[in-house]
Design a protein with these regions (language model features):
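C-terminal alpha-helix
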Residues: 99-114
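Phenylalanine-focused residue identity feature
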Residues: 15, 92, 107-108
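Primarily recognizes the serine-hydrolase "nucleophile elbow" in alpha/beta-hydrolase
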Residues: 1-22
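Active-site-adjacent alpha-helix of alpha/beta-hydrolase-fold enzymes
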Residues: 22-25, 29-94
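Conserved, well-structured beta-alpha core segment at the onset of a catalytic domain
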Residues: 14-18, 29, 112-114
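Divalent metal-coordination and catalytic microenvironments
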Residues: 5, 57, 108
Length: 114
């Protein structure tokens, strides 16, 4: 049984907004301000508007769609479009990610441990 979940750069199209008004489990979100694949105003921001009980665990304003992929796929195996969608935007530093990982772990400890 799933007792808590964390979504990174969630896609709003996957959800009926009304179904997020009262989720049956704690939901945490990691959002990226420069996601060109799932534009925040149509996706993560929409999920946050619909899901007031959701917890924004971390927001990376300069992060792109692949912020939680570690390591990133090698550029040599990506096509041009995939590279544009998955590459880190200029100004994004992956040095922030260990803190994001700690926040995710803390969210799960809070909701899963007795």
């Amino acid at each position: 049984r799933i007792a808590a979940a964390v979504a990174g750069v969630p896609a709003a199209a996957d959800f009926d907004p009304a179904s997020l008004a009262r989720p049956p489990i704690p939901l945490g979100l990691v959002t990226a301000g420069r996601d060109i694949w799932l534009t925040p105003r149509w996706h993560s921001d929409a999920v946050l508007r619909a899901c007031t009980p959701c917890v924004r665990i971390a927001h990376l304003p300069n992060g792109g769609h692949s912020i939680l992929l570690s390591p990133l796929p090698p550029a040599a195996v990506l096509g041009e479009v995939e590279g544009q969608l998955l590459a880190d935007p200029p100004g994004f530093s992956r040095s922030q990610l260990p803190e994001v990982d700690r926040k995710i772990a803390s969210f799960f400890r809070q909701h899963l441990l007795p």
